[in-house]
Structures are given as C-alpha cells and as structure tokens.
Amino acid sequence: MTDQRPLTIALVAGETSGDILGAGLIRALKERVPNARFVGVAGPRMQAEGCEAWYEIEELAVMGIVEVLGRLRRLLHIRADLTKRFGELKPDVFVGIDAPDFNITLEGNLKKQGIKTIHYVSPSVWAWRQKRVFKIGRATDLVLAFLPFEKAFYDKYNVPCRFIGHTMADAMPLDPDKNGARDVLGIPYDAHCLALLPGSRGAEVEMLSADFLKTAQLLRQTYPDLEIVVPLVNAKRREQFERIKAEVAPDLSVHLLDGMGREAMVASDAALLASGTAALECMLAKCPMVVGYRMKPFTFWLAKRLVKTDYVSLPNLLAGRELVKELLQEECEPQKLAAALLPLLANGKTSHAMHDTFRELHQQIRCNADEQAAQAVLELAQ
C-alpha cells in the first residue's frame, strides 16, 4: 500500500454467486477503509457497492463445454487484457472470486508480476482432480475457504489457506421459524410436510423427478395428510417437472413453488433432494433429509474413479460420517428412498438427533465470513 493513493483492490467475479460474495466483501472493506478503490469484473451488486466494472459479469458467466468453446477467444482476450491492465495498475491485492478455470490462471499471471493474490472460494480439489492444489499454490498467496475440511486439505499440501466460515451460515438463523414458513406457504401447522428438490439443472430434474414423485406416492400411503412442496428454480424447470408428473403421478397433489427453496426446507419435516449446495442449505434450515442422486451410467462410473471422498453431500463431509442417508444410482429408487424418509417424517429420535447435529455444524461454520474475508485482504495488503 502506498501513501499516494487509496487502498486498491482488484476483483474478478464470474457469476451471480460471486457477485453476492464480492458485494459482501466490498461492504466489509469499506467499513474499515472508507476511501478504498475497487476495480475489475463485477456484477450489479458489486457495482452498487462502488466497484468500477471494467467488464460486466455476464462476459464470464458461461456454462458447459459447447458454450465455453464458443466464447473461448473472447474469454482469452479478456484474461489477457486484465493481466495487462492489472499489471499496470498494480493493485494492493487481487481477489479472484470463484470461477477457478478463469481466475487461477489470471492469479498466476499477476503473482508473477509481484501482485498479491487471493482465491476466494476453494474449488472442490479435495474431492477430485486433487493435483490442481499445486497450481493453486503457485498462483495464489492465500485461499479463503468456506469449510473447515477444505483448510485441512490445503494444510496437508502447505498451501496458505484461511477458513472464514460460510456466508450462507451467516445469513440463516440458528433456529428457523418453521410455523412462519408454513404460514407463507399455506401449510397447516399439524400436517406432515415433505419437500422434494430434484435439482436446478435440466439433467437432474429429468433423472430424479420420476423416482422422487413415486417416493412421495409411497409415503402418502403411511401419511395420508402429507403435504408435498416442490420448489423449482425457474419456469423451465417447473414446466419440465410438470410434464414428468403428468406421466408418472398425475393424481398426486403437490404445491409447486417458483423458487422459495429455503422456505420449503424450513417448513418441512423432511426433504428429499439432489446433492449440491441444496444439501448445505437444507442442513442450515434444520430440515432432516435424504440425498438421492442419479446420473448417466458412464458419468457415474467415471465419477467413482475420480472422486476421492467417502460422501457426496456437504452435511456428511462436515460431520465426517453418514449423518444423512445418501442413495446413489441404483439405490436411488422409490422403495429405498421412502424407507429412509419414513423415520424422519415421524419426528422422533432420528430427526431430533439430526436436527441437533445440524445446529452444531451450523455454529461451526457461522463465523461472519464477510468480515473474515475483509480482514484477510487487509492483512495481505500490508
């Protein structure tokens, strides 16, 4: 940091989730250093906090091999331009927020020019393609990790890493208002309630919806009053789910929701969901769950050989044991899913024990992540 200019932080966020993280980080930094300058690739939230956008976030937000290949020349041009302009600007710290395929190479380019670099949000190196940890170690001065087992992984390879807690854990209350969520969704307080979350991607909804619906039909036989809520991320996924339901379970009454996944989890006695961030959110909502997941046979075969962890869901990875049932591939079928969910819907010892462990894990990762990230940036900038 020089006396002639304000603290200057360069940031690159690659998608909406990164824009949210970036905005929280900028807000926390401005509280400590009001005249700091922020520049880089930013979305509307980061810009609203005062970040100067050299490129809009949409430029980097591409998914899938075909889309990336179609935009590759443009992406490479942006990375080369940022390498040059950040090299001239010499920010006090560069923060690459997620988007590892784009940011880690950029971080390496900048580190070679003497710029201090942080990678915010660890890629899943602990799960697969573990050798990426060496590239990350060469490219960054510090990794900011959401989860404690991520820091333990980096420590093993002597890559500087700081566990800052998870922003989602900060945003969600330790004791959610179940009745309040039921009021919002129109669910009676005394009814049994099941949330079905078949995923946010088209392929997931296609592979999981039929089995999830058949599971709900089986559970209705035991609990005739069972309310079923199905939050879907957008109109496309809703249309897809409705088509599958018309074929598989046309007479099954369900509450279809546009978004409102968090409310559905808080309101429910149990959830059946695809793995991913939804499992972490469900844990933070204190909703007992079963994880069911299917993929194409070759993809599953490949994943089994690449993935180095014993579990796929974040609650189990955090607990270091099978806290929630994971039924994958052939095991992801209605009879087994229903059998795993029945004791959870009973609201007995099983679900109470799970709820208590969820609360303990929530406290472990509720560390005021924005403040922790800001502190790490300022320490590196010294």
From Swiss-Prot:
Provide the alphabetized UniProt keywords: Glycosyltransferase, Lipid A biosynthesis, Lipid biosynthesis, Lipid metabolism, Transferase
- Gene Ontology terms, MF aspect: lipid-A-disaccharide synthase activity; phospholipid binding
- What Gene Ontology cellular component terms go with this record? membrane
Q: Which GO terms describe its biological process?
A: lipid A biosynthetic process
Q: What class of enzyme is it?
A: transferase
**Pathway(s) per entry:** Glycolipid biosynthesis; lipid IV(A) biosynthesis; lipid IV(A) from (3R)-3-hydroxytetradecanoyl-[acyl-carrier-protein] and UDP-N-acetyl-alpha-D-glucosamine: step 5/6
Organism superkingdom: Bacteria
Report the SUPFAM superfamilies cross-referenced here: UDP-Glycosyltransferase/glycogen phosphorylase (SSF53756)
What CDD domains would the database entry show?
Answer: Glycosyltransferase_GTB-type
**E.C. no:** 2.4.1.182
Q: In which family does this protein belong, per the annotation? A: Belongs to the LpxB family.
**Protein purpose:** Condensation of UDP-2,3-diacylglucosamine and 2,3-diacylglucosamine-1-phosphate to form lipid A disaccharide, a precursor of lipid A, a phosphorylated glycolipid that anchors the lipopolysaccharide to the outer membrane of the cell.
The identity of this protein, by name, is: Lipid-A-disaccharide synthase
| Natural source organism | Shigella flexneri serotype 5b (strain 8401)
